[in-house]
Each structure stands twice: as structure tokens, then as C-alpha cells.
Amino acid sequence: MKFGARIKSLRTEKGLTLDQLAQETGSSKSYIWELENKNPPRPSAEKLSAIAGALGVTVDYLIGSDTQTLSDAEDTAFFRQYSGLPEETRRQIREMARILDTKTRK
């Protein structure tokens, strides 16, 4: 998959509009559109990092050097969010996970 198509695919999978991704990355809507539709794109390392972060993937995945799946990327994004939560909230999430695990094993 080409770079621009990868961005567009990830963006739509996450339910983000061009405007929303642009806002999350400090870019313009037209810049994101150009990245998705022009070849070859030339984003800076800083922009690549911002876009990858907003889409919940690694830069390597974004540029096609890694085959991390969207599911893996979602897991990575979840754990990134999880690690930033207060300890009590993380404890509650772990307890919920144990309860759900018990229910699914029955």
C-alpha cells in the first residue's frame, strides 16, 4: 500500500475527517489531502511522527517499513493511553479485564 493510501485508510478506519486529522497534527486540511493524494509526498520527520501518533501507529508502519496491523496499532494506542492514566484508574481497568475474561471463558 502506498504512503498516501495508508494514511487515508487509517484515517477513515479511525473515523477521522481530513479536518480532524489536520487539527490533531497541527497541519492544514489541504496538506493532509496532498499527503493522501500526491506522489511522492515529502513530509518532515516531525509531521510523520505527529500523523503516526494521531493515527495510533508507528512511523515505520506509516511509511511501509513495518507490517504492524491496524489491530496492533489500536493495541499500541490503547496501551499508550493506559500508561498515562492514574494508578487507581489502571487498577479498575485491570479488574474489569479480569471480569470480562472470566465471563468469556464460561
Regions found by a protein language model. Name each.
Residues 26, 44-61:
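DNA major-groove recognition helix of helix-turn-helix/homeodomain DNA-binding modules
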Residues 16-35, 39, 50:
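Short alpha-helical DNA-recognition segment
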Residues 7, 48, 93:
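Aromatic/hydrophobic pocket-lining residues that form π-stacking "cages" and hydrophobic walls in ligand
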Residues 67-106:
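Interfacial/linker helices and their anchor residues that mediate assembly or domain coupling
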